[in-house]
Regions:
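Hydrophobic transmembrane alpha-helices and immediately adjacent juxtamembrane helices
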Residues: 1-259
C-alpha cells in the first residue's frame, strides 16, 4: 500500500493533466461544447419522467429531481465500469513506451466522469429551487456519500482493468450486467415503496447489497427529503471499497509487466 500511495503522489499531476486534455478534446469539435454534459442526462430525465410518470404512473415526491439524482450518480458509475474494461488496451501506445501505474489511468478517467457529474449537479440544485425543497444540515451528508461512491468505484475499476486485459469478451458481459443492475437500482422508482410493498425482503437485500442502490437512495434522502442517511451503511461500503482497492492494486502490481 505504501508503493501505491507513493505512486499516486508521483503521478497525480499526470492524471489531472490527462483528464483536462480529455475534457477539452470532447468539446473541441462540438457546437454546444460542455453543455452536452448537462443536456444528455437532462433529456434522459425527461424521457424517463414521461415513461414512468405518465405511462407507469410512478408518483415519487419531487419526481423529476428524484430521477435526475439517480441518473447523475448512475451515469458516473456506469461510465466508469464500461471505460475500465478496455482501459489498458486503449492506452497501450502510452504504457508500452513509459512506465505508468495502471491505476493512474483509472484515476484520470474518474476525474473526467466526476467533473461531468459535478456539472450535472447544477441541474439538481436548479430542480431543488424549482420544487422549493427545504434545506437542512443533512445535505452535507452528500459529501461522505460521494467519497464512498468514489472509493467503491475505484476498487471495482482496478479489478475490471486487470481482467479486461485477458478476457476479450468481458466488455460485452459488463454491458449486460450493468443493464441488469440498472433496473435493480431504483433509478426511476423507489425500491422501498415499489418493491418493498410486495417483496420487503428483496427490497432490503437490494438496498443493502447493491452499492449504487444504497448510495442513490442515501443521496435522495439527504438532498430531497432532509433525512439522514444510514451512516453505518456508508462506513461499511467505504470499508468494502478499500478492500476491493487493496485487492485490485495488488493484482495490478503483480501482473503489470504482462499487460
Amino acid at each position: 500500500m505504501k508503493r501505491f500511495i507513493n505512486d499516486m503522489e508521483k503521478y497525480y499531476r499526470y492524471a489531472v493533466y490527462s483528464a483536462k486534455a480529455e475534457l477539452k478534446a470532447e468539446v473541441a469539435g462540438s457546437y454546444l461544447n460542455w453543455i452536452w454534459w448537462i443536456l444528455e442526462p437532462f433529456c434522459m430525465m425527461l424521457i424517463y419522467a414521461f415513461i414512468f410518470g405518465f405511462v407507469f404512473d410512478a408518483r415519487e415526491k419531487y419526481f423529476t429531481a428524484f430521477i435526475y439524482v439517480g441518473l447523475t450518480l448512475w451515469t458516473f458509475f456506469n461510465q466508469n465500469m464500461k471505460n475500465s474494461v478496455r482501459m489498458v488496451k486503449k492506452n497501450k501506445s502510452i504504457i508500452s513506451k513509459v512506465y505508468l501505474p495502471k491505476f493512474i489511468l483509472i484515476e484520470s478517467k474518474m476525474m473526467v466522469n466526476g467533473f461531468k457529474m459535478l456539472v450535472s449537479f447544477g441541474i439538481v440544485i436548479i430542480l431543488m429551487i424549482f420544487y422549493q425543497i427545504p434545506l437542512s444540515w443533512n445535505v452535507f451528508y452528500a459529501i461522505p456519500i460521494l467519497i464512498c461512491m468514489w472509493i467503491v468505484n475505484f476498487g471495482l475499476m482496478t479489478i475490471l482493468v486487470h481482467f479486461g486485459v485477458y478476457v476479450e469478451d468481458l466488455a460485452n458481459v459488463v454491458n449486460i450486467v450493468l443493464r441488469f443492475i440498472f433496473y435493480l437500482t431504483g433509478i426511476m422508482f423507489s425500491i422501498e415503496h415499489r418493491i418493498g410493498a410486495k417483496h420487503p425482503e428483496l427490497a432490503l437485500f437490494l438496498e443493502k447489497f447493491n452499492p449504487m442502490a444504497f448510495l442513490i437512495s442515501s443521496m435522495r434522502k439527504c438532498l430531497l427529503y432532509g433525512e439522514r442517511p444510514e451512516l453505518l451503511g456508508i462506513v461499511s461500503w467505504i470499508g468494502i471499497g478499500i478492500v476491493l482497492t487493496a485487492l485490485g492494486i495488488h493484482t495490478i502490481y503483480k501482473n503489470e509487466n504482462s499487460y
